[in-house]
């Protein structure tokens, strides 16, 4: 774990990093798109960069192809202040690619090229265990559970981090087309469920994992386990709901003109982890937790206003400026309503 010398706690993110190819226009199929924009992505890498841009300490552990794309991605991590000592390069496999279809509302569909890609080939003996042991928070998804040897590397890294005292953060980041079957996806995603201290799922993932279309607290709480400290369900434009052992509630999001929702959930998670890494007592204080989640919602909302994941992740200055503007708008709206009530409008 991080030392108590005043240095910020380290958040280590484990998993995949890839290239997203995002269409230049929304609302068309991949074959109909006139062109694509190249954008770095991969949920765990997105979270690491989100943390760093917000002023936190972040490291990434994973494997990239020993190709132009792989070295480009490693350079992007370094450029954004993310520790890259956990990266390995594979000479025999390519960096993963994903083509993303954008609907008119900014939601996405994916087509992946990873058969196998370098991230799937990370071995347990390639892990930087010293880096993992230094984590105060260890974050991961489920894509690294799909195949060996990466699954074994994932399990080893998670075990080492837990033994070292790290808080474990899990965002399944369901990508159903990558799994052999929906049943296999559920089984493997849930196989490590009770290890995590913090779990974030989307409303789509909640329905998938519970096989229940009813989006209510009872459905969400069916995913609770005794060792869990915080369960979060993100609801897109409806904000998020939160559950702890002592309290639960919801926090509204901010309404923006969404262009691309890629990376919004990762931005949310990165903001949350960056805010709690050095003071985990926030998880037991509802008022403070709500403030943190409002900040995380703001970061997620900002991310949807630009195309691509990593290019859209906000800095701490951008996030605070956004919140300040939102507060000013709310104040002006309240004043306008008061004027109309106090005098003829």
UniProtKB/Swiss-Prot annotation:
Task: Look up the record and give one Gene Ontology term from the biological process aspect.
Answer: fructose metabolic process
CDD domains, alphabetically? Answer: bac_FRK
Q: Name one GO molecular function term.
A: ATP binding
Q: Does this entry carry the keyword DNA-binding?
A: no
Out of the domains of life, which is the source?
Eukaryota
Pathway per the UniProt entry? Glycan biosynthesis; starch biosynthesis
Report which reactions are catalysed by this protein: D-fructose + ATP = D-fructose 6-phosphate + ADP + H(+)
Q: Which UniProt keywords apply?
A: ATP-binding, Carbohydrate metabolism, Kinase, Nucleotide-binding, Transferase
What Enzyme Commission number does this protein have?
A: 2.7.1.4
Q: Name one GO cellular component term.
A: cytosol
> What function does this protein fulfil?
May play an important role in maintaining the flux of carbon towards starch formation.
Q: Which PANTHER family does the record cross-reference, listed alphabetically?
A: FRUCTOKINASE-2-RELATED (PTHR43085:SF47), HEXOKINASE FAMILY MEMBER (PTHR43085)
Family according to the record = Belongs to the carbohydrate kinase PfkB family.
Kindly provide the name given to this protein in its UniProt entry.
Probable fructokinase-3
